[in-house]
Amino acid sequence: PKDIGYILIMMGIAPGQRVMEAGTGSGSMTIALATAIGLEGKVISYEQKQDTQNLARKNLERLGLASRVDFKLRDIKEGFDETDADAFFLDVQNPYDYIPQVRAALKPGGFFGTILPTFNQVEKTLNSLKKYNFAFVEVCELILRHYKSDPNRIRPTDRMVAHTGFLMFGRKIE
């Protein structure tokens, strides 16, 4: 959750946009995207597993956001139906394998984002983005540290979730 707001900003997600994602999962990113694109936008969400997609759909229905999302059940190796997305968030195990398909789905100047748990994935994805002509590529990690709010003992809390993943962003250029 600490990463989602930053992802939306870095990918320029705004009302009225056509945004894609692959790797729907429980739908937490889908919910954030659907909220950000507003009533006039559309999220197209690809997932490979029916039970996972069903869970995400239920979560969006509970929040009244399901009408903003087109759910598609498909192995993304086959590519995507769309070719004019403003942005694409890829949350799959080997994102570097799907960069050509993502590139084909994005409009020129379209934003790309992904989350990667390991350095190995970062390296492979960077190489793939370079190979397929993405620009303005950035990699970062967000660290959130909470503090005890006792005025007499202001200090960091005893525990902290440090690493959720590396975030990577880029833009499709011609």
Predicted segments with their positions:
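C-terminal substrate-binding/active-site "lid" region of AdoMet-derived donor-dependent transferases
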Residues: 96-166
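Helix-to-beta-strand junctions that scaffold the AdoMet/dcAdoMet cofactor pocket
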Residues: 37-38, 65, 106-110
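Conserved SAM-binding loop of SAM-dependent methyltransferases across substrates and taxa
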Residues: 26-39
